[in-house]
């Protein structure tokens, strides 16, 4: 059973209105965290900010790539000009580096690239 890196887009929706599937994944210890996602969420306005950030920080983390590794990954996979940003490439690289990991996102461009890399996870 794969473990899932839950992208910022999914977390934002969940924090606005509870996502049953995400709750199930959390309860089954299948959710992974990346420091970039944690940081993106920390930049926003969060109700119960300290509590949420503490809980998220203590989720299992993926193996994270260095900036140099991400640049090499971007070049090797030809991810330039595909409509995703550097943080997204970090998430993709970390997902590839972590055996059995998949990424769940609601961002259409990130999802398309994840699908092309065969690391996308879909809720349906």
Residue ranges and their predicted role:
Residues 20, 61-124:
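Active-site neighborhoods of divalent-metal-dependent phosphate/nucleic-acid chemistry enzymes
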Residues 2-3, 25, 32-33, 37, ...:
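A generic "structured core" feature
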Residues 58:
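Conserved nucleotide-sugar phosphate-binding/catalytic loop shared by glycosyltransferases and other
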Residues 11, 38-41, 110-111:
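A generic structural signal for short hydrophobic patches within well-formed alpha-helices
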Residues 1-33, 42-54:
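Short, well-structured N-terminal submotif of metal-dependent ribonuclease cores
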């Amino acid at each position: 059973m794969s473990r899932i890196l839950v992208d910022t887009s999914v977390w934002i929706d969940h924090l606005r209105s509870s996502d049953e599937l995400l709750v199930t994944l959390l309860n089954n210890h299948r959710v992974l965290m990346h420091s970039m996602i944690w940081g993106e969420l920390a930049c926003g306005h969060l109700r119960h900010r300290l509590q949420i950030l503490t809980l998220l920080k203590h989720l299992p983390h993926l193996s994270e790539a260095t900036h140099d590794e991400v640049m090499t990954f971007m070049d090797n996979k030809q991810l330039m000009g595909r409509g995703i940003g550097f943080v997204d490439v970090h998430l993709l690289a970390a997902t590839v580096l972590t055996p059995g990991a998949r990424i769940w996102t609601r961002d259409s461009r990130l999802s398309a690239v994840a699908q092309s890399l065969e690391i996308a996870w879909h809720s349906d």
